């Protein structure tokens, strides 16, 4: 009887865990983000983002302390959310947080943007427009 209760407890615990996000190698990530209904999120600081990011990515800074609040406003839970950072450290935390928040389809770039750049994949830089008022 104890074995049966233990087995039931293990099964119950296993079914209550948070679903996991997928970490994709660079080529698979590139194919995935080319699909419609995918939102690409750069979780680095705005300064890092401005230096260069994957085309079409929006910036939600993981370190800023309001990631969840910004994600709720900017991201659609019915779409695939593709996250990345420079070395795939912050993006892991961001992906886990998104899953906890109820996002069902979250993917993360394995090895981060540095490997993307080293492989010669395209990035774009944010160029600030300076307007002078007289």
Predicted segments with their positions:
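Sec-dependent bacterial lipoprotein signal peptides
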Residues: 1-13
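Rhodanese-like catalytic fold shared by cysteine-dependent sulfurtransferases
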Residues: 4, 16-38, 47-80, 90-134
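Intrinsically disordered, low-complexity boundary segments flanking structured domains
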Residues: 11, 45-48
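Structural scaffold elements adjacent to functional motifs in cytosolic proteins
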Residues: 40-42
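Short, surface-exposed ligand- or partner-binding patches at beta-edge/loop junctions that are enriched
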Residues: 84-85
């Amino acid at each position: 009887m104890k074995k049966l209760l233990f087995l039931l407890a293990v099964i119950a615990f296993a079914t209550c865990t948070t679903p996991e996000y997928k970490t994709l190698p660079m080529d698979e990530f590139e194919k995935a983000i080319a699909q419609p209904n995918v939102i690409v999120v750069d979780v680095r600081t705005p300064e890092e983002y401005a230096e260069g990011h994957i085309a079409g990515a929006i910036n939600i800074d993981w370190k800023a302390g309001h990631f969840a609040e910004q994600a709720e406003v900017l991201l659609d839970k019915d779409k695939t959310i593709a996250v990345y950072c420079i070395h795939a450290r912050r993006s892991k935390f961001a992906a886990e947080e998104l899953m906890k928040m109820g996002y069902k389809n979250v993917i993360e770039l394995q090895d981060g943007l540095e490997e993307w750049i080293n492989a010669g994949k395209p990035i774009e830089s944010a160029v600030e427009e300076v307007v002078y008022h007289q």
